[in-house]
């Protein structure tokens, strides 16, 4: 029988920002209780997704393979409207609204600094949207004019965007919890125990989910056997740091976390994750270069340290035409891994001829590869491969400028 079990446990506090966590870590485990389980498959959701999106794939895997499937609602996963986030405004949003209206000569009998809630903000913006439409009809503004404003995204569970570290630790903690509290029968349990680690663990993710899979392998390499990754970022370069949420401090139009274009005809909202990270160098929450590089799987010195531990296998896909992540970054990452003795299978999609309409559907970010087919193509072979020896010191440290992360 297929079992779907939801867990809620304590996980990590935010050690970087010295913030006590108030929320529980939630995850779901799906397995067939009639089978002896050979591996844990962890499907990691990307931005805009959560475990509710994974149930069909989880049950497919549990029915067709001898695996238990883990899906984790990691820290700040509810940071998009479709996963429960709500809009809010802060002082900077009010200032942007005020100065933007002044720039096009719109004066309202409202003190913008008195706007306390998003609902109040929405009413003003709705009025401005209609006023802009009137100005367009009167030829005072061009038809293609669009006003850009900013708003914040308040995640569920009163969380905030730490980005990467707490999310990866949550995934690792969920894996460790299941290994300690196995609810299913394990195939070759004596071999698993002898090899110094838990049951074979496979991380699968697309985009941000793939990024977190690689980050888990960096933080806790002895707990990960295979990373199966489609189109992830391996640095925060190419403006990818904007997903942290402090981009409104620099250029709110260029560096938003996500654009909201469906609410108003004449206004686009640049939305930003709620975060304590800031560009203010005087703040204890300053996002320094050290904070950046610890979050980047692509760091040669860090990879050298990781190579001293049990080595996960990497299987990855990436398009030459990916609009977010440069293929060259990924090539560099996997070339370094190979040099350091990691097993890597890196599939580069570089030509329209590779589009088959079923597995590879386009040349854009993610290549349209269905998660089910990605799993179907690789999982059986992964399960046939021997469990690696994980006997090692279960602690790793990475020097990041003036900081050391352990």
Please report, for each region that a protein language model flagged, where it lies by residue.
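N-terminal cap/lid segment of alpha/beta-hydrolase-fold proteins
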Residues: 1-39, 95-101, 159-162
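Short beta-strand element of the alpha/beta-hydrolase
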Residues: 37-47
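A fold-wide structural signal in alpha/beta-hydrolase
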Residues: 40, 66-75, 202
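Alpha/beta-hydrolase active-site loop signature
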Residues: 48, 73-78, 234
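Short amphipathic alpha-helix adjacent to the substrate-entry channel of hydrolases
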Residues: 53-72, 143-144
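Alpha/beta-hydrolase active-site loop
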Residues: 90-191
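Primarily recognizes the serine-hydrolase "nucleophile elbow" in alpha/beta-hydrolase
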Residues: 177-248
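Serine-hydrolase catalytic core
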Residues: 252-406
């Amino acid at each position: 029988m297929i079992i779907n079990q939801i867990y809620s446990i304590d996980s990590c506090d935010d050690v970087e920002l010295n913030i006590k966590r108030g929320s529980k870590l939630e995850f779901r485990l799906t397995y067939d209780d009639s089978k002896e389980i050979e591996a844990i498959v962890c499907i990691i959701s990307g931005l805009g997704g959560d475990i509710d999106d994974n149930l069909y794939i989880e049950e497919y895997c549990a029915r067709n393979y001898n695996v238990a499937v883990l899906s984790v609602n990691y820290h700040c996963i509810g940071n998009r409207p479709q996963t429960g986030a709500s809009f809010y405004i802060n002082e900077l949003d009010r200032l942007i609204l005020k100065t933007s209206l002044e720039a096009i000569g719109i004066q309202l009998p409202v003190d913008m600094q008195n706007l306390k809630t998003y609902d109040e903000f929405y009413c003003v913006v709705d009025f401005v949207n209609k006023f802009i439409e009137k100005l367009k009809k009167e030829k005072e503004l061009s038809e293609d004019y669009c006003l850009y404003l900013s708003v914040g995204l308040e995640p569920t569970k009163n969380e905030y965007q730490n980005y990467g570290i707490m999310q990866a630790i949550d995934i690792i903690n969920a894996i460790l919890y299941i290994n300690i509290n196995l609810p299913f029968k394990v195939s070759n349990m004596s071999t698993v125990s002898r090899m110094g680690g838990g049951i074979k663990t496979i991380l699968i993710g697309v985009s941000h989910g793939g990024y977190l899979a690689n980050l888990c392998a960096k933080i806790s390499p002895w707990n990960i056997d295979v990373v199966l990754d489609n189109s992830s970022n391996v640095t925060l370069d190419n403006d990818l740091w904007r997903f942290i949420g402090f981009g409104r401090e620099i250029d709110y139009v260029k560096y938003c976390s996500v654009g909201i274009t469906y609410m108003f005809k004449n206004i686009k909202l640049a939305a930003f994750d709620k975060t304590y990270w800031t560009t203010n160098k005087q703040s204890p929450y300053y996002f320094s270069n050290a904070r950046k590089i610890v979050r980047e799987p692509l760091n040669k010195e860090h990879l050298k340290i990781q190579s001293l531990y049990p080595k996960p296998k990497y299987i990855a896909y990436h398009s030459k035409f990916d609009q977010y992540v440069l293929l060259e970054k990924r090539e560099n990452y996997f070339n370094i891994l190979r040099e350091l003795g990691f097993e890597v299978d890196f599939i580069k999609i570089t030509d329209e001829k590779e589009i088959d309409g079923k597995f590879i559907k386009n040349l854009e970010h993610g290549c349209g590869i269905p998660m089910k087919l990605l799993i179907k193509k690789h999982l059986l072979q992964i399960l046939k491969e021997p469990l690696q020896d994980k006997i090692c010191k279960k602690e790793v440290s990475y020097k990041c400028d003036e900081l050391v992360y352990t």
